[in-house]
Amino acid sequence: AAQGLIQRMPPDLLRLGLLGGLLGLDGTAVGQFMISRPLVAGALVGWAVGDMELGIGIGAVLELYILVSFPTGGARFPEGATATAVAVAVAAPFSGAGAVPLSFAVGLVWGQVGGASVNAQRHFNSLLIPEARSNTALSFPPGISHLIAIAVDFLRGSAVTMTGVLAGRLLIGSVIYWWPLPSSASTGLLLVGGAVSVGVLLHDLGGFR
């Protein structure tokens, strides 16, 4: 049954799930080599789906949207790597003016889902901290706890990415032909949104002085 389920999956889904897990790890758990930034993640996912130009383009614009979020403290923020991976992977199989903007919207929404999953994982990780042991805490040696947290983060990133790609492709496939704008207007719409995000960032930093 499991083999049949795998055979019915889109051929690139497992590959995207693996990449989503690695990008999720780079966010905080392992490395922080910045490959989880939208621009880099977009290029990697674009390569994985066979359209690096698409990946770089979506990643570059998403970078403008994500720059306004400063992931500090325990606040919840959209996960840029998840948003980018889902947006690029959802857009890749489709053509037409609506493919990128609709996939972009799906990616932004799923970035919020990714952010919520990070918060849930932080709660799980708190149960692994030796100093915070209580009746509900899990009892593992520190080294094992660290490995468990890394494995859970990888699985979280993979699961969120795969479900986002599946849901996004199903949604876009049913509504893409209703998209009313031509390609030039669609691109302009995304860039205007990015410009607004950059304006908010500049305002928060004090603007031009």
Regions found by a protein language model. Name each.
Residues 23-25, 46-48, 66-69, 90-95, ...:
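Hydrophobic alpha-helical transmembrane segments
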Residues 64-106:
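Long, highly hydrophobic alpha-helical transmembrane signal-anchor segments
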